[in-house]
Amino acid sequence: MSTNSPLRSRASLAMLPLAGLLTVLGLILRGPLGNPSINPSGFAQSAASANFGTSWIIILLGSVARLYSFMILFGLLGLTRAGKLVFWAMLLSIVSEALFISLTGILVFTVPVAAQLYLQGDAHMLNVLMAGFFSGPVASVLYPAGLIGTLGSILFSIAIWRSNLPMWAGVLYGLTTPLLAFAPAFSYGLELLGGLLLLVSSTWLATAAWRQTIRETSSRTGQSSMISST
């Protein structure tokens, strides 16, 4: 791919670590994701706090950055021998992330209102939260979306392993989606680990791609100088 492509520009490559950074910041601010069926009062107090909405907005901004990062990875890897694999990795990852954004976006604006009503004495709101979001149609879509995203991240991992980018960065990247998608149900630590792996692997890949771009640019400049001097 041409080094002049916008996909290889500094700003575009910055989207890779930015997605990881926003995800980690959002998870730290949000804290453990409580279960309203186990501790309804604790969950309601957490969801009604200012941090809940703010943290989820940051997480969703990270997801938007991830959508763009999938296209960045396709631009970096699409012309390698794993080109077809990368296309499917990008497609599956975009579908998964788009489902996550559309569904959890509802939670950002609905759950805090329902939690405040519950704290004001409307116990029916707990049933609304459980039936509508945590065990209802939203959950029935989020988990398949997580499986789709996991497959996409694994395909990206394989493509990175076959490319000239750092192989182990690809391994770390392949672990991010399954941890972020499924760990929240049982372990905040593993969920946070998924965010940290996303930040580390994305930064590693962006740095390696940027250095490769500099080397290619220097090589082309040197060749041009040689041609002009002859």
Residue ranges of model-derived segments:
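Hydrophobic, aromatic-enriched alpha-helical segments typical of multi-pass transmembrane helices
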Residues: S2-T230
